[in-house]
A protein has these predicted regions:
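The substrate-binding groove and active-site-proximal loops of carbohydrate-active enzymes
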Residues: 1-7
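Active-site-proximal substrate-binding groove within the catalytic cores of carbohydrate-active enzymes
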Residues: 8-143
């Protein structure tokens, strides 16, 4: 198994050497199999495959303990049957890390689509600061 992993990493290094601007997300089974050999190579690491925005908040709040903020991909899934608060919650979860926008965006109401757009525009205004940011947990890790 170790030889297989090393062969894969060697192949991956060759891909990134040939295509240095290539961006590939490391899913790692929704972040469950994250390892530092992969983190050293991939610019994006999925933190979870979770779709429930209420539970994803804890994942987003703690992701900085294992990943750099600019590398930690936080999924934002506004649900087609959700409301405005759910849409806002989804966007806020992802703002301080790296937004992975998903869901049935074309099926959202105009108001909810505008909230997603506003969240992404705000994210674009702060994303250069994210890579210099340091995570802080004044009350300990979120539970």
């Amino acid at each position: 198994m170790l030889e297989h992993e090393r062969a894969y990493l060697k192949w991956l290094d060759g891909v990134f050497e040939k295509y240095p601007e290539l961006v590939i997300e490391n899913c790692s089974s929704g972040g469950l199999r994250t390892d530092y050999a992969m983190l050293a190579r991939y610019s994006i690491q999925s933190t979870s495959d979770h779709e429930d925005y209420r539970n994803y908040a804890t994942i987003a709040a703690n992701a900085g303990a294992a990943l750099t903020p600019e590398q930690a991909a936080i999924w934002s899934y506004p649900l087609k049957d959700g409301d405005e608060e759910e849409t806002i919650y989804n966007m806020v979860n992802a703002l301080l890390l790296r937004i992975h926008q998903s869901g049935h965006l074309a099926q959202l109401s105009k108001e909810r689509h505008a909230l997603v757009k506003e969240g992404i525009e705000y994210y674009k205004s702060i994303r250069q600061d994210i890579k210099k940011a340091l995570p802080v947990w004044p009350n300990g890790f979120a539970t």
